[in-house]
A protein has these predicted regions:
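Internal alpha-helical scaffold of NAD(P)-dependent oxidoreductase catalytic cores
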Residues: 1-89, 120, 127-132
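C-terminal active-site/capping subdomain that shapes the small-molecule cofactor and substrate pocket
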Residues: 93-137
Length: 137
């Protein structure tokens, strides 16, 4: 995978101005964008990135697996995937949450749990469902 520095944000921190200026020049020479953050902010932005990127990608992978195992083209999910990401960028995700967990739709939740055969996936579904429900109490 190629890294295009003009497409990512680089977070920099230094103990003195000279080092900070050197870091800025390096990022600019790579045609990158930088933001100065302290150590706590950098740790928290990394945590946020894991939720937004790694965990979301994992969920997409699980959804794709369900499609493939059931002879459903994953391309059918592309519109909802694009819509979800675009709305999350442009609006408050807390105001956009939909689905059986928010509605407390026990019939659909039960159906989904019956469809999930893997014990760990079932636990993950239950944990995420509870997290969504708790967020909207």
């Amino acid at each position: 995978t190629n890294i295009y520095f003009n497409e990512i944000q680089i977070f920099i921190e230094a103990k003195n101005k000279n080092d900070l200026e050197l870091q800025k020049k390096l990022v600019i020479s790579l045609e990158g964008k930088y933001e100065c953050l302290n150590s706590k902010q950098r740790a928290n932005i990394h945590l946020s990135a894991v939720w937004i990127n790694n965990f979301v990608n994992h969920m997409i992978s699980k959804g794709k697996k369900i499609c493939l195992e059931n002879n459903i083209s994953f391309s059918l999910m592309e519109p909802i995937l694009k819509k979800t990401i675009n709305q999350a960028i442009n609006y408050n995700p807390d105001e956009l949450q939909t689905g059986p967990a928010v509605r407390n739709d026990k019939d659909t939740l039960g159906l989904h749990l019956n469809l999930i055969k893997d014990v760990n996936d079932k636990k993950l579904y239950e944990i995420i469902t509870k997290s969504i429900q708790k967020n909207y109490e």
